[in-house]
């Protein structure tokens, strides 16, 4: 047991208490880093070739806020990111390239810049690029929130 009166002021604060700081990642600065990652590691080696956007005040924690993860994913022509599913929900905002796809529970969607695709929790999904140009999209997942509830797990197909 512990006395509430000794910790109450740190449990319930008069103002929000967050380590999240505002930050901007400029496309002109990030695009080439993402494209360069294609020569550093293959999609097969990485499973998902992603550069994580970490909040500068949360280095090493793989999160952009207390509850959200974000990363920039690259799939080169001819590559496939194999099917898997996980308890986290995901969103994808396509930023560069035309013609790659995301398939959610077998339903294939061709991706173009500006498209917004959601992947509900625990749905099988994979990505592939049948086009002749690299594809980049922003991945957003609720990984930190799901981790907070100790509910994070995943399954690979086969």
Predicted features and spans:
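Transition-metal
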Residues: 1-55
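A short beta-strand-loop-beta hairpin characteristic of the jelly-roll/cupin
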Residues: 76-113, 119-123
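Extracellular structured ligand-interaction cores
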Residues: 70, 88-89, 124, 132-137
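Short, structured patches in soluble enzyme cores that scaffold and shape functional sites
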Residues: 74, 95, 123, 129-131, ...
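Double-stranded beta-helix
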Residues: 130-158
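Short histidine-centered beta-strand/loop micro-motifs
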Residues: 61-64, 80-86, 129
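Activation on folded, globular domain regions of eukaryotic proteins
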Residues: 23-27, 65, 71, 138
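A short glycine-rich, His/Asp/Glu-containing loop-to-beta-strand
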Residues: 39-77
């Amino acid at each position: 047991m512990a006395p509430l009166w000794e910790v109450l002021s740190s449990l319930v604060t008069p103002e929000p208490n967050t380590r999240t700081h505002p930050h901007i990642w400029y496309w002109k600065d990030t695009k080439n880093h993402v494209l360069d990652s294609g020569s550093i590691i293959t999609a097969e080696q990485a499973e998902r070739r992603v550069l994580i956007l970490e909040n500068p005040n949360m280095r090493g924690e793989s999160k952009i806020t207390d509850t959200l993860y974000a990363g920039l994913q690259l799939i080169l022509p001819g590559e496939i990111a194999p099917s898997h599913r996980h308890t986290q929900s995901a969103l994808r905002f396509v930023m560069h390239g035309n013609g790659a796809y995301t398939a959610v529970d077998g339903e294939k969607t061709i991706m173009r810049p500006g498209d917004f695709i959601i992947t509900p929790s625990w749905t099988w999904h994979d990505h592939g690029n049948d086009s002749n140009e690299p594809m980049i999209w922003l991945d957003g997942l609720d990984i930190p929130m799901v981790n907070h509830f100790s509910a994070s797990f995943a399954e690979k197909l086969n």
